[in-house]
Regions:
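Extracytoplasmic small-molecule ligand-binding "clamshell" domains
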Residues: 33-109, 248-249, 268
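Ligand-binding clefts/hinges and TM-proximal coupling segments of bilobed small-molecule sensing domains
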Residues: 34-35, 160-176, 219, 223-224, ...
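Periplasmic-binding protein-like
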Residues: 52, 127-135, 215-254, 272-287
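Ligand-binding cleft/hinge of the Venus flytrap
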Residues: 60, 73-82, 161-185, 215-217
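Short helix-initiation/N-cap motifs at beta->coil->alpha
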Residues: 86-96, 140, 180-194, 230-232
Length: 287
């Protein structure tokens, strides 16, 4: 009988130990399952990635990040009631950075590309993102987008503009028209504007809202040429697993659209208004 009692005591001790270990692993599992949105709310702060060299969406003025996108972000942060740490990063580090967990989400304009929509969770759009071309004012050598054959085209490195420029050149070659003289890539778009003004390149490829503002602010220097793509949009993105954060951001953008705040900000920063859809803007297979 004594042996049975001792055996039972050993068994009970082991059972308690195993239960404690399982409980510990369960608690660790619960903690690791916390979403980014839950973490933001729990800690009362968020870190976001921005390229503040993309006027008028985000740019530096008097040492601070300002712009259309910043005003949208401020509206959302006020609703969350958390502390904001907004990082100003080169575009080339933005998308890899969010996937690596260096910040919570991308609060800068991301164009819709087939290779991106399967890697990142896109919010609803914040603006139109159709890719256009801009030339020097009065450059009679270039009157249509087909006239880019033999010309020097400039855009941003690793941007949607780069991908679309390469795709359009391939189409020109397929039609037997030939390609560009060169495709020059810049770290930030403002560098390409300067290169165009100085005659180093013949055309800048970028999204329409940005180029329209550049033309408006520099009359007699630049002209819009033509669209390079069909109508598209620009959004913010999160990591693919952060769909609750993506959905929250989308809900606030839609709220701003419906209460007139987006149009108010568009009037302020662009001087014209854009209609923002809440469905049908992403290609098949998007997250």
């Amino acid at each position: 009988m004594g042996k049975i009692c001792k055996s039972w005591e050993v068994f009970s001790s082991k059972t308690i130990l195993i239960a404690a270990v399982l409980a510990l692993f369960a608690s660790v599992g619960t903690a690791s399952a916390e979403t980014t949105l839950e973490k933001i709310k729990r800690t009362g702060k968020t870190t976001v990635g921005t390229e503040a060299a993309f006027p008028p969406f985000e740019f530096i003025k008097d040492g601070k990040i300002v712009g259309y996108g910043k005003d949208i972000l401020d509206y959302i942060i006020a609703d969350l009631g958390v502390e904001l740490n907004q990082l100003d990063l080169p575009w080339q580090g933005i998308l890899p950075g969010v996937l690596a967990g260096k910040f919570d989400f991308v609060a800068t304009s991301v164009s819709i590309r087939p290779e991106r929509v399967v890697k990142y969770a896109y919010t609803v759009p914040i603006a139109e993102g159709t890719v256009w071309t801009m030339k020097r004012a009065g450059d009679d050598r270039i009157n249509s987008i087909d006239d880019l054959v033999g010309k020097v085209v400039g855009t941003q490195l690793a941007s949607g503009g780069e991908a679309n420029s390469k795709e359009f050149e391939a189409k020109l070659k397929e039609r037997g028209l030939g390609g560009y003289k060169a495709l020059k890539l810049y770290t930030a778009y403002p560098e390409s504007y300067l290169a165009l003004a100085n005659g180093e390149i013949d055309v800048v490829v970028q999204t329409l809202p940005n180029l329209a503002v550049v033309v408006k602010e520099h009359p007699g220097v630049f002209e819009l040429l033509d669209a390079m793509t069909g109508k598209s949009y620009m959004c913010w993105v999160t990591r693919p697993e952060d769909t609750d954060l993506r959905d929250y951001l989308s809900s606030k953008i839609i709220e701003m659209r419906d209460n007139g705040k987006l149009h108010e900000l568009q009037d302020k920063w662009f001087g014209f208004r854009m209609e923002i859809p809440d469905s049908g803007f992403l290609p098949a297979g998007a997250l």
